[in-house]
UniProtKB/Swiss-Prot annotation:
Organism in which the protein naturally occurs: Lycosa singoriensis
Swiss-Prot/TrEMBL keywords: Disulfide bond, Secreted, Signal, Toxin
PTM: Contains 4 disulfide bonds.
Gene Ontology CC: extracellular region
Expressed in which tissues: Expressed by the venom gland.
Family note: Belongs to the neurotoxin 19 (CSTX) family. 06 (U6-Lctx) subfamily.
Location of this chain's protein in the cell: Secreted
Propeptide residue interval(s): 22-25
Signal peptide range in chain numbering: 1-21
Main location: secreted
Keyword Signal (UniProt): yes
GO MF entries: toxin activity
Name of the protein in question: U6-lycotoxin-Ls1h
Amino acid sequence: MKLLLFTALVLVVISLIEVEAENERACIPLEKECTKTPGNCCSGLKCDCYRRFEQGVAKGIQCWCIGKDVTYKGV
């Protein structure tokens, strides 16, 4: 009986680990933020980062998944 319970517990833990790993691999869609996971954009997209400034002071970096052939320029 103890062996059966232990085996069931091990299988549950392994299943949870596999589900979590699968969720981490999920790709980030177009125009969604990829600052913390720059390599997870869906196929055909790239993670493009920008340094944000407010009144001349750098306020951090933000990254977004955009098309690989898309380029943004300042106005």
